[in-house]
């Protein structure tokens, strides 16, 4: 028997791996999400587990995985440890996790690999050769990581700031929103959001790679993709009819100005009271002919004397999703339990797309005549961006807290942030709205110690805290 528990931080697709293993006669103990290390290890002992599995969706999960590995070593565990989830990689497992635990630590890239890995680890004849091969692979991964040179040279924070994106604030008038303040969208019908669904990531979540709609005609996976597409649409039909899932969202548009790499948000147009400071990070590698981008560059600097504004949003496509998934599981229908999660994830993303369009055309109103097809929306052929904390342009997750505080998200629509700043329900999107026509997405990528210190100071964090939250952007 394999007793596998899910990691103590939220993960989407948490049931995929379990389903695949159960179908191959492994017994699974799924502890759910946000479970402490102590509970994981205590349960593993109680049930006589053969393997422990951890899965993580967002970057803070990575630190927790390291902590679990260290605790397993300290407490003398002899079980293999499986690592998986969206934020994990073979390199991270080899460099950060594996060296903290004497027993096998194996990165599982997808659910389909899990059975072979588990069988190899539990078969006394297969295990020695399998573990030796993994050890060799990790040694190579660590060596490659150590020798990896950044593609471009790092520069000091002062140098990066001197090379900021210089926008013409003299000849440009930032558009004033038609509707300032916070607005709630308590129950947007599924029928409104369906046309905004981007289906390509849906197929990817089922490990079917291909662009929609071409994937439906694919010689190899077209038939499977078509069946899955039909099932997803049947589920959407059902959600439209029975209204068992609620899609709720909230937006806010506020007076704001840039101050260095931060953005001040004001209580009203007098701009005398700062209600929140948003902290951003700047690219810190040498750029040939390009600026060192930072999101704060896209809001008029305070010293320009130009009034500007910023938006914030949070949406979920999954209020009620958990109960439906649990009901399917209780009925031993794992396929539909996973399908409802995948469909609600798509609804959340569609909601973010729909609401951003409404903001551009109506609430902020700087593009009232915009008329784009869904394909054009997916390609982002519009003015402005909606970067999300935790993603490359603003990779630090605790900034979600500012969105929650500015909008009163939890009180208004019930969406919560966990201790690791993951969003609940899991089918959720949150972020910022920038209106500047030159605003664009970019990756902050690797930053240097001087920026970490500066960020810690701006955020009121200790250096250790800042290093923890900025971990993926440090060498």
How should these model regions be labeled?
Residues 1-3, 7-14:
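Short, small-residue-biased leader/transition segments that mark boundaries at the very start
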Residues 11, 112-338, 342, 363, ...:
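Active-site loops and adjacent core secondary-structure elements that bind or stabilize anionic groups
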